[in-house]
Every structure is written in C-alpha cells, then in structure tokens.
C-alpha cells in the first residue's frame, strides 16, 4: 500500500531536517497499515517500505536501550532473520559516495548483531523483572560494541537512509 503525502508536507519536513523527513514517511507508511506492522498486514507493503519501518524500529530500540533491548522486546527475528541487512547493503550499493560505505558498514553491523542474536537470543527474550533486565547489560557485554558503533554512526546512517529515500521517494509514498 502506497501512502499519499502532500508535497508541501514533504517540503516542510525536509526543511526541518533528516529526522523530520524520515518520521513523516515512516508515519505515513505505518498509518497505511493501521499503525503497526504485523504478519497480517506486511504483505500490503513493499520491501523498501518494510525496510524503512525496520530501520525506524531498530533506531528507536537501540537509541533507547541498545541491541539487548531490541532483542528482549521481541524484534530480533524481524531485524536479524529477515533480509533487512541485505536491503540496507543494496541501498548502499546504489550510492556513489561515502553514504554507500556508511550503509555497507551498517549492514555489516546488523550481520554481527545476527550472530549474537543467534547465540544469545533465547536468554535475552525470557520474561524478567526490571532489575533482571538491567542485569542483562552486565551479563552480555558482547553487545556494547554494537551499541557504541551504531550510536557513533547514527547520524550518518540516518542521513544515508534519508538520502536513499529522497532519491527513490515513489517506492515509499505517492506525493500529491
């Protein structure tokens, strides 16, 4: 399903910056499927739209609580066991400058996360108290480097994602 976004809304969001631009596109996509991506409505979106929603979810979780939180909250299979990293790498291949390298490096980060998810996912998704959840960060320091790498490169990654979307806007929405 391709959401329709007024051209002036896109212009206004782009003028506010990368985050506002991505938020507008992501919210329009999510609204087109009643606000939440799930197995029942995923087929209504194309691979590009699903990848943007995946990036949005990853960004929110990792910026809030790292990859441990992302996995604990049940997003591990969606992020790591689907072609998210591959699509991000392909987006990067279409870019000629440093942004392509940024997305290529980001895809490698996701593949590293997948290895850790496959190794520790069962333990990290167990129900637990808040104190037990906080203890996971001490028990699994392997995720620290992933968190640090994402946070250090987040602005560049987000800018590259936004640039790709801007260059392929018709894959994400219809502008009226």
Model-predicted segments: where are they?
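A conserved position within tetratricopeptide repeats
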Residues: 92-95
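Extended, alpha-helix-rich binding/interface surfaces that flank or overlap catalytic cores
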Residues: 2-85, 97-176
